[in-house]
Swiss-Prot record:
Family under the similarity heading: Belongs to the tRNA(Ile)-lysidine synthase family.
PANTHER family hit by this protein: TRNA(ILE)-LYSIDINE SYNTHASE-RELATED
Name under which the protein is recorded: tRNA(Ile)-lysidine synthase
GO biological process terms, semicolon-separated: tRNA modification
EC number in record: 6.3.4.19
InterPro entries xref list: Rossmann-like_a/b/a_fold, TilS/TtcA_N, tRNA_Ile_lys_synt, tRNA_Ile_lys_synt_N
GO CC annotation terms, alphabetical: cytoplasm
Catalytic activity entry: cytidine(34) in tRNA(Ile2) + L-lysine + ATP = lysidine(34) in tRNA(Ile2) + AMP + diphosphate + H(+)
Gene3D superfamilies in UniProt: HUPs
UniProt entry keywords in alphabetical sequence: ATP-binding, Cytoplasm, Ligase, Nucleotide-binding, tRNA processing
Compartments it resides in: Cytoplasm
One Pfam match: ATP_bind_3
Amino acid sequence: MGLSPVNIFKPFGLGRAKAVIAAVSGGSDSLGLLFLLKDYLSTLESPPVLIAVTVDHKLRAESALEAENVGLLCQKHGIMHCVLSWDDPKPAHGLAAAARTARYRLLVQAARDAGAGFIVTGHTENDQIETFLMRKARSGHCEARGLAAMSPRSLLEGSVELARPLLTVSRQALRDELTRRGIAWVDDPSNANIDYERPRVRLGVAAEADGQEVLEQIAQAGAARERDNAALVEALADPATLGVDAAGMMFLNADCYAALSPGARQLFSGLLASIAGGRRFLPGDGERRRIERMLSGQDAPRRLTVFGALIERGEKGAPHRFRRERRNLPKLDLVPGQHIVWDGRFCFFNSGGRSFEIAPPGRQELIDFLKNSGRDIESRRCEALLISPALYEGGKLAFVPFLPGAEWPQGVHIERHFAIFDHVLPGHDFALAQAVEARLGRACAEIS
């Protein structure tokens, strides 16, 4: 008896989408996904359009032909198919990570172009076990949040849901399914190349591991992650726990922080460091412990710089403070029609007809700007503006946001951006991301 498409896909609610993107490389996992998904969608009264997308990473001479063969197979079975190519220069280091980033960027663009609400991938139970073992080897201990491994659901770029419905299905079960259907697959030789981390793990520790035991450890890590998240969600429900000013400095109530468990404190302060620094990931486990020790008064320094964030311990009842450090702040062009993220902290939309440069103001430049506009800003607020974006036009400082009554160009909109959540949001953290956004908000107010 074969696999049940209904049991596999029904929990994901794919029927509410206009279209569904299936990521298909031509390997057994993705082809198994494609044909099971096709069968499932055929059971729906008004099924979404199924579009198979093959990303050609241009890393092997055979990849173009393999992508073409996937297209021929799809044509034979009445499935829409397109090929997207990663044509950018390839990095000398971190190739696998760069390829993964490019792949998801291309898949998200394909989903947006097609109006698809879902991208569905063929990650299997085997991949889940390998992911756990890889992350455990990197972290060096059994309490890392990443040991919850891959979430069945994630949100990409704030708009497209990533579904991994095969995380409880083995690779062999998919191959048996394809064999039963008479469908051949291609084995990518890079999957056996031990120069890459995953093949090393697959051919090494994963081959020797007790799969059921690993899956139990994944479940335990997931439960621990949910407990820490739930503690933060509860804390964030109290408005007194966390505040933020217009420029993004955050104020963490020291008593509320101290009342949390050590694990929740490490998560909370690490999360705020990531937000303040505009980073897409949490600081490492060791860095999170270091922040927690400093804020809890166990280490002597009253301030730390971590992940681009300056963190200061509050004394005598004062809140702990998290803000961006004043280094490595970017300069970006903002042209008409553009949507751009600045420093991982602010999102700009330009629907007007003027072009600008986004950059932090220089100190004397800001002082002169404030003087010429008749404003007197105290030093603390001035420091906040020095780590904030300003708009330059023709090489001159033209607009400074967050000032009371400040002029602002027509058609330019700015809002807060959470890099750690807004690009890839694992389903494990959906509730936590919602709680953070509810407490900090997206709107940018005036400096007060």
